[in-house]
Amino acid sequence: MEKNLPDIFFFPNCVNVFSYKYSQDEFSNMSKTERDSFSLAVFPVIKHRWHNAHVVKHKGIYKVSTEARGKKVSPPSLGKPAHINLTAKQYIYSEHTISFECYSFLKCITNTEINSFDEYILRGLLEAGNSLQIFSNSVGKRTDTIGVLGNKYPFSKIPLASLTPKAQREIFSAWISHRPVVLTGGTGVGKTSQVPKLLLWFNYLFGGFSTLDKITDFHERPVILSLPRIALVRLHSNTILKSLGFKVLDGSPISLRYGSIPEELINKQPKKYGIVFSTHKLSLTKLFSYGTLIIDEVHEHDQIGDIIIAVARKHHTKIDSMFLMTATLEDDRERLKVFLPNPAFIHIPGDTLFKISEVFIHNKINPSSRMAYIEEEKRNLVTAIQMYTPPDGSSGIVFVASVAQCHEYKSYLEKRLPYDMYIIHGKVLDIDEILEKVYSSPNVSIIISTPYLESSVTIRNVTHIYDMGRVFVPAPFGGSQEFISKSMRDQRKGRVGRVNPGTYVYFYDLSYMKSIQRIDSEFLHNYILYANKFNLTLPEDLFIIPTNLDILWRTKEYIDSFDISTETWNKLLSNYYMKMIEYAKLYVLSPILAEELDNFERTGELTSIVQEAILSLNLRIKILNFKHKDDDTYIHFCKILFGVYNGTNATIYYHRPLTGYMNMISDTIFVPVDNN
């Protein structure tokens, strides 16, 4: 469906597009093309104003029940009006008078083609659209947006590239085409903060109709923005809620979905056309109940995110529109061209609002000498922060590879620098509180973070990035630090330059950067289980295909050996994380154990009941050797004795030397086996 977005339906960015009500005199002076633009108003008017409406007679005038109160009456016969009263907005016949809107209400019946609308119908649609506040113009003021979506406060002023008229037209054409859309743009153009809002607007106006060429029945479904982490769900939903002029969730078009969501974050009066901010896990549980699917941070290749892409592609007829958003297609463009059916690629040009300066700090040690390289890096970091210091009241972000390094670098910096130090990563629960301290402090704040802060979170007062250029890539029973890819570098650099000019200080040679194929270092059971649930053909229906298919097939055989029915697996998938697939054997035993185990997976709280249950699974590891690392850490070289990776070597750190065997509780907790 090729359809351009008329100017009158632009989303009000409150910069050069404002909410606007058109007069009948303005309509009279318009060209035919401009007048015809109002024909598309029939779709939002049918959904949001005329649904369940009827004809009434009010003071002798036929009107729609949404215009005035009155007794329900049979509609009059309609021919060409004898006279038009532009002031009263009425068509006058010899025997009756009818409002412009009521005339249109009676004429706009199912299967009527919109290009058949005459001037009389269009005038009524203009009035109905004015009442809904769905029109816009290049002149106006912010306060005109109050009430557009039931909001008590005006929309935010947004100068970002994604809400320019040009970008709005391009995004609308792609959305209405029902083709899968891959949307890229420089960090800071408003992909995460504005494009979902724009798609919400299009969904509010036109979502649920099979075509915009004629009037049909509609099936209204919300938009969903699927995100890899709960913190992102909370942050982005709050940003868009405020920018749409709301202060509370109830009654707004914004809803949140994630596990163990608190009562105060549940929208008890959601809108059918609204937007749901959800974790990937919960997006999959009701994927086909949404009309427009937006998957953000595609470049991260979050496992469940990649599975959603595979499922949506396999069942694309069940979704009206799919948007994949990423800062860069450095690693994925060719795969997406082949994988998606006839995709549309949209790039929103633009850069951060403010200039970003780059500074390279050379590390004279070769990274193959890991410990010496890191020690030199820490010394360089102190020097760099002293030379390139955020102003008072501002902050800098230090990107390191892992949670352990966050604590290591924070401890090192605190002894040498007089600034406020904070740690933020995916397991930190009080991020909002930390950010409030950062924003309210008159001092310099230094935030040490994992790659967690790469993703879309805009810290308002950050002026400096100090990038170590590494990421920890988890692998079954271990993992390794790798140098980042170009897309990760772009994300980190783009954390500054949004609110103020910024400085990006990097401590790694650019030649070290490389693409990271995450699926080759992941447990693969989710791919198997969701493939079974959604009838995916393996491996060809996967977005990213593992290099070693033997592991995929061994995983399938291992899952089959559990003797758990497909129906039960589907229930487990919908309700539990199952970070270790063996936990499934415990989840099916009893509801009480399932509740405690689920709490352990979510919070890390390990009760004796859960520990004993996991120990009963006999997830045994043989200790081959060990060596002393430092005062309270010993490195143990081990062999896995269970599951898909039986026989695989693993390295495990423990606070004292061990021999014999240990049992695995989780990917980070191990219990020595008593040799007596």
Swiss-Prot record:
InterPro entries: DEAD/DEAH_box_helicase_dom, DNA/RNA_helicase_DEAH_CS, Helicase_ATP-bd, Helicase_C-like, NPH-II, P-loop_NTPase
UniProt subcellular location: Virion
Superkingdom of the source species: Viruses
Pfam families for this protein: DEAD, Helicase_C, NPH-II
Ligand binding (ATP): G185, G186, T187, G188, V189, G190, K191, T192
Helicase C-terminal domain residues: 366-535
The EC number(s) this enzyme carries: 3.6.4.13
GO cellular component: virion component
First-listed, main subcellular location of the protein, grouped into a coarse class: virion
Subunit organization: Monomer.
Family: Belongs to the DEAD box helicase family. DEAH subfamily.
The protein's name in its UniProt record: RNA helicase NPH-II
Organism: Vaccinia virus (strain Ankara)
